[in-house]
């Protein structure tokens, strides 16, 4: 699943490719991609609108249009590709935006889980899925004191708590594993058991890991490519995710893989020891 660094990289690429272009026509091959309004209304409303900008909130893309905001979530395998209108249409292409200059933005999704929604202009940040998100993982809005207070309220394991997007947004499976490894915290450690120094270390690790991943253009594990068709490079810097059986870069102990909250989870059994009772 594209996480914050991948979605931010897609946003930057799309900004270069389609901002300023006017939509001539929208073709929808898989109607379920369109959450609302009805497909024919979606197509009709977009025709003639100009893309004025592209924003991101968590893992959501917000296309700023002349008359609406269009919200897009890539979910598991969604991606955008930029084409000439006469280019061959690839398998798994579900939505095509044709511009007045003869170029196209195409949405492809092997799993068909991605969704698009039209909302009134400048109301993208009021969308229900976006309103539920925690702060972005940057020091100006992600505050250590608030993060610490939030963790104290939860006895659940730290990994699923970080994945639910309410304390801080943008973390998915890859970057939670990486941040917990950097902070030397076991993924099943109860959140309310973390000491202030551990919370501070984790807070900084979240900011650091995501910032470095954005700079690297994200992580390409399977199918992720940015809007320019380029792979991310952060996979070469992964310390724990996907490193099962390889020596820990900090202590040399083999990395292990387990399941936490039904998610494949990687950690170092030496550096990230569970303190106290294991949560179920």
UniProtKB/Swiss-Prot annotation:
GO MF annotation: an example = zinc ion binding
Q: What are the UniProt keywords, alphabetically? A: DNA damage, DNA repair, DNA-binding, Glycosidase, Hydrolase, Lyase, Metal-binding, Multifunctional enzyme, Zinc, Zinc-finger
Which InterPro entries has this protein been placed in? DNA_glyclase/AP_lyase_DNA-bd, DNA_glyclase_Znf_dom_DNA_BS, Formamido-pyr_DNA_Glyclase, FPG_cat, MutM-like_N-ter, Ribosomal_uS13-like_H2TH, Znf_DNA_glyclase/AP_lyase, Znf_FPG/IleRS
SMART domains in the record: Fapy_DNA_glyco, H2TH
- What does this protein's record comment on cofactor binding? Binds 1 zinc ion per subunit.
Required cofactors, per record? Answer: Zn(2+)
Q: Example GO biological process term?
A: base-excision repair
Zinc finger map (FPG-type): 239-273
Q: One of this protein's Pfam families, by short name?
A: zf-FPG_IleRS
Has UniProt tagged this entry with the keyword Hydrolase? Answer: yes
Write out the residues that bind DNA: 92, 111
| Reactions listed under catalytic activity | Hydrolysis of DNA containing ring-opened 7-methylguanine residues, releasing 2,6-diamino-4-hydroxy-5-(N-methyl)formamidopyrimidine; 2'-deoxyribonucleotide-(2'-deoxyribose 5'-phosphate)-2'-deoxyribonucleotide-DNA = a 3'-end 2'-deoxyribonucleotide-(2,3-dehydro-2,3-deoxyribose 5'-phosphate)-DNA + a 5'-end 5'-phospho-2'-deoxyribonucleoside-DNA + H(+)
* Residues at the active site: 2 (schiff-base intermediate with dna), 3 (proton donor), 59 (proton donor), 263 (proton donor)
List its EC numbers.
3.2.2.23, 4.2.99.18
- Functional description taken from the UniProt entry: Involved in base excision repair of DNA damaged by oxidation or by mutagenic agents. Acts as a DNA glycosylase that recognizes and removes damaged bases. Has a preference for oxidized purines, such as 7,8-dihydro-8-oxoguanine (8-oxoG). Has AP (apurinic/apyrimidinic) lyase activity and introduces nicks in the DNA strand. Cleaves the DNA backbone by beta-delta elimination to generate a single-strand break at the site of the removed base with both 3'- and 5'-phosphates.
Tell me which family the UniProt entry assigns to this protein: Belongs to the FPG family.
On assembly, the entry states: Monomer.
* Name the record gives this protein: Formamidopyrimidine-DNA glycosylase
| Species name | Enterococcus faecalis (strain ATCC 700802 / V583)
Q: Which gene encodes it?
A: mutM
